[in-house]
A protein has these predicted regions:
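Conserved HGGG/HGGXW glycine-rich cap/lid loop of the alpha/beta-hydrolase fold
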Residues: 2-46
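Conserved catalytic-core motifs of eukaryotic protein kinase domains, centered on the activation segment
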Residues: 22-24, 47-53, 112-113
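Active-site loop/oxyanion-hole signature of alpha/beta-hydrolase fold enzymes
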Residues: 37-75, 203
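Conserved strand-to-loop "acid loop" that flanks and positions the catalytic carboxylate
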Residues: 165-172
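Short, aromatic/basic amphipathic alpha-helical patches
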Residues: 175-184
Length: 203
């Protein structure tokens, strides 16, 4: 837990190669009154490093799902790679995720919408800490089909038909995120606007 508070929980999901900050970003801290939590994805920050890579966005969704079970329910704020993970988790666990905010950050584009040419990449083995080079390699090329992202956006929107649970606060918009924005009911704006609106709805 990064910050105590009174009200709904908020869970921060960081970008590719990053870790949970010691304190939440100012625009988050000033816009949210409830407790704020953070999570280090596998291969990042203080989390464990598996041998030989094999990272996928779905692997990180499992990390975030475990954190969500710990806190019970939470609004998700995803940055970069964390935005994509947040969207998937919000679609899978809509009863526990009343809102999700997608923002810019490292790894937001992923590996495009279709698989590329097969290749084998061997990161430098002398690096022993985090971020795991395998995580950087695998997740930077993780495929993100537009229809896949749209499906999860629809799960979020249909689970909360009387509110606006899905906000896009990113300037960089790869194809998967453009597909999300095209869905009716998705709102665009700043992170403070999104959090203020979500917290008001949940009061």
């Amino acid at each position: 837990r990064l910050v105590d508070g009174e009200g709904p929980n908020l869970l921060l999901l960081h970008g590719l190669g990053e870790a949970t900050p010691e304190a939440p970003p100012t625009q988050v801290a000033q816009s949210w009154q409830g407790p704020i939590y953070g999570l280090d994805f596998t291969g990042h920050g203080d989390s464990s490093i598996p041998r030989g890579g094999g990272y996928t966005s779905e692997t990180l969704v499992a990390d975030a799902d475990a954190a969500l079970r710990h806190v019970g329910s939470a609004v998700l704020v995803g940055r970069g790679l964390g935005a994509y993970v947040a969207l998937l988790l919000a679609g899978l666990r809509s009863a526990q995720v009343p809102g999700v905010v997608l923002s810019d950050g490292p790894g937001i584009a992923g590996g495009g919408t279709e698989p590329g040419s097969p290749s084998i990449v061997a990161p430098a083995e002398q690096w022993a800490g985090t971020p795991d080079p395998w995580a950087l390699t695998d997740l930077a090329t993780d495929v993100r089909p537009q229809d896949y992202a749209q499906a999860f956006a629809r799960f979020v929107l249909t689970a909360h038909p009387n509110r606006h649970p899905l906000w896009v606060c990113a300037h960089v918009r790869p194809p998967w995120l453009e597909a999300v924005v095209d869905e009716a009911g998705v709102l665009e704006g700043s992170i403070p606007d999104a959090l203020t609106d979500l917290e008001r709805d949940l009061a």
